[in-house]
Amino acid sequence: MVSVPLRWYNIAADLPEPLPPLRDPEGLREESRIALLSRILPSRLIEDEYILARWVDIPGEVRKALARIGRPTPLIRAEGLEKVLGVKGRVRIYYKSEAVLPTGSHKINTAIAQAYYAKLDGAKEIVTETGAGQWGLAASTAAALMGLKATVFMTASSFKSKIQRRLLMEAQGARVISSPSKLTDTGREALEEYGSTHPGSLGLAIAEAVEYTLESGDRRYLPGSVLEAVLMHQTVIGLEALDQLPEEPDVVVACVGGGSNFGGFTYPMIGARLRGEGFEKTRFIAAESTAAPKLTRGEYRYDGLDSSLILPLAKMYTLGHRYTPPPSHAAGLRYHGVSPSLSILRRLGLVEAEAIPQEEALASILLMARSEGVVPAPESSHAVALAARIARKLPDGSVVAFNLSGHGLLDLDALQKALEIRGASMW
């Protein structure tokens, strides 16, 4: 019987080359951005970020909380999807469902650990950013579980369109602020430059959250993705999947925003491959949005993690820290960069990537709903779309596995759009 993992997996121990260190922006005359991390992040999170051990023990209180919220999550044979795609009897498809968690997505896995770390530091409030609201809801829930206040900067486009998830955050006691806002210098500058119609971006929301965190020593900033510690916390997904999969997949797919979902699902398998312990022929493919195609069209270089260069620079695939993605129903994928470890794997050819157009992703919401009875989040539907696209082309006997990172029951705007375009045959 599968149980909650005792340890996280840290891919840094198995990468073919060392992770490039974070850097300060050139010509910086102010406080070191790297030193700044010690003022805003939970101290234990910083330890997790730089640890080199392959296996890291999950604190008992965190593991207990993960069990309370419903881990381990199920791995499901998608027989209905196989039938609709016309591959039943030829290709087997499995998906790991993070949608069954109470907050509706994988984000709660690291939120619990980070809120616990903030509590250990004696913090009274956690601060973060969110796009579609999945991370904001997870952080708000984790804060409530740990007895902490929460402030969430939500990208303006999602603040208006993802009302239900915003209400759920507020139900957990969080204060939710539309970004860009007038609460910070960063937000005010963006509003002055672009006006009140600015859709916001994750990079901008991060900058606001960090600036707000710095105003009080009782606050800690919780990052939702990109940092290696966050990806490590998410490996509970892939570690469970290793115990659940009845056979080794030929193709493994997950959507990618900053990298935590993709890394969480695939890194335990990629790590096994790097150590020569299996998955030698498996293809690992990231499904990104055409609205933020960093892995397919970005540059591999040092760039800011946020739009205002408040945080350090990381070496990663990036579209540029000032890039403002167009509005998208998959707000959680609207980030300009991706984690350094995933960037290395992409550059070395160990990970492939494909950008999925919004219409194809939205149509895949209905594909999954009508074949499996599950409404995926707009972000997760990118993985569904790519898995479906690939499954049709695979030879007999092939196996596909993908991560369903969250449900779309609160993404009614995306569902409405999907229903409007359902006449377009995408499968």
From Swiss-Prot:
Task: List the GO cellular component terms.
Answer: cytoplasm
In terms of HAMAP family, this protein maps to:
Trp_synth_beta
Gene name tied to this protein: trpB1
| PANTHER family attached to this UniProt entry | TRYPTOPHAN SYNTHASE, TRYPTOPHAN SYNTHASE-RELATED
Report the residues modified as N6-(pyridoxal phosphate)lysine: 107
Reaction it catalyzes = (1S,2R)-1-C-(indol-3-yl)glycerol 3-phosphate + L-serine = D-glyceraldehyde 3-phosphate + L-tryptophan + H2O
Q: Could you tell me what this protein does?
A: The beta subunit is responsible for the synthesis of L-tryptophan from indole and L-serine.
Q: Which InterPro entries match?
A: Trp_synth_b-like, Trp_synth_b_CS, Trp_synth_beta/beta-like, TrpB-like_PALP, TrpB-like_PALP_sf
Q: Does the keyword Amino-acid biosynthesis apply?
A: yes
| Keywords of this entry | Amino-acid biosynthesis, Aromatic amino acid biosynthesis, Lyase, Pyridoxal phosphate, Tryptophan biosynthesis
According to UniProt, the name of this protein is Tryptophan synthase beta chain 1
**Could you describe the subunit structure of this protein?**
Tetramer of two alpha and two beta chains.
The record lists the membrane-crossing segments as none
Q: Which cofactor does it need?
A: pyridoxal 5'-phosphate
* Position of the signal peptide: none
